[in-house]
Amino acid sequence: MTPTVVPFVKASACGNDFLIIDGMHAPADLEAFSRRICDRHDGVGADGVEWLFPAPDADVRARLFNADGTEAEISGNGTRCVAAHLCAEQAKEKITVRTGAGIKTCTLTSRSEMQFEFETAMGEPQVGDEFSVKLAFREVRGVPVSMGNPHYVVYVNEFAPGWQAEAAEIGRHHDFKYGINVELVVIKDRNNIEVRFFERGVGETRASGTGSGASAVASIATKQAESPVRVHTPGGIQTVRWENEVFLRGPARLICRGEFFL
């Protein structure tokens, strides 16, 4: 018997990796399938799946499912990976992607074979007042920022060993009913910050587009930095401009094509 296969493209933006799949191949249970294919031992392995569907008002509609199967509003890096895929397929320099957080426009700034760089118009952020969260052993203060998805930005002097456990505790704190993405930020100077990410539905990631945006916006809002901000992550550098709207600039690389057996 010939197995049923689901074609995919794998892409990465600063080490934040995604599987891109045409919605025509979508199974009935997107949550379970996304969890299965993202598994790094028994699946292909990725931080999430971008499912692509037709859109009347954009080049494509992208539904993002995290590695744990939960659906999220948007990934800045995932959106850039989708743009790279469409750019390679259609030879376009401007890609519009309808996400759960609205339409995002990705403008190609450079390309070398399957390596792309885009600047993405991410929309206007919402910045809240800094507040504290009580954890099991201490209290932390952070700045809430919405980039179309929720973030809590915490400033630290250094990334202490085991920071992931504390970030996970923040992310599931009862103050955040639906969970939250957590960023730990070290200010390097007025235009450079270093960030670690713990994403809702994924865990630690090497980079995050919306997380980079949230970290830069929070740093500017609290007068610790000024636009543009270079965000240094374990996966590379992204640049954030905040001019009412946030503009996120960074790379995306198409890694491979493949087929996943059902």
Give names to the regions the model predicted:
Residues 1-114, 153-262:
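A glycine-rich beta-to-alpha transition motif near the start of alpha/beta enzyme domains, typified by
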Residues 114-122:
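Short, solvent-exposed secondary-structure boundary/capping segments
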Residues 126-128, 133-138, 143-147, 246-262:
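C-terminal domain-closing interface element
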Residues 149-151:
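Internal alpha/beta core interface subdomains
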